[in-house]
Amino acid sequence: VETRRITVLSAGLGVPSSSRLLADQLAAAAERQLAAAGYAVHIETVELRDLAVDIANNFVTGYAAPALAEVIAGVEASDGIIAVSPVFSASYSGLFKSFIDVLDPKALEGKAVLLGATAGTDRHQMVLDFAMRPLFTYLRTRTANTAVFAGPQDWGSNDAGGSALSTRIERAAGEFAGLLQGAQPRQKPATLESLPFEQLLAGISGRP
């Protein structure tokens, strides 16, 4: 049985947070759909809030503390990423972006990604397509077409809102699972040979 490794990144700040709640539901739906397709699934959930100090220190020291280094290694070893951020000032949170910035620029290349966002008003739902998706496109990920936004009406006793959210989650998880079913083992990039500057110039000019 093939195994698919998924890292879930939740950038929620509260305990509990709506971002974590959405992340858990997305992960559970993806696990169900992959299991139905015959895959074993390993899920690692990361609360970025717990790494906030280590992330900040990494920027000024260039050193990743053991806990942060372990999470980075887990992300790099994953087949897929579920990334959920709260919305602040019409974009993803600073904590979320800071974690992405400490990763190697090629760490997410080729990985399947499922995006989610939460906010206190529906006015922020476009953040998925105007902020988060461009970020992951730049990082060359394979991002599910459907991203999931959850606002206040999607939680609590509103049955209609909860049903609509569940439908969006199942659709997005299905697309994500489809990307993971086609995932290939990630190959390390070929090591580039470092040549003397004079030799590089000679190659450009055609001289031996």
Predicted regions span which residues?
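Helix-loop-strand module that forms the ligand-binding subsite of alpha/beta enzymes
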Residues: 63-139
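Glycine-rich phosphate/pyrophosphate-binding loop and the adjoining helix
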Residues: 145-208
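Hydrophobic alpha-helical membrane-association signature
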Residues: 22-26, 128, 172
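Generic secondary-structure signature for well-ordered alpha-helical cores
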Residues: 31-36, 137, 141, 174-185
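A short small-residue
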Residues: 2-10, 112, 148-157
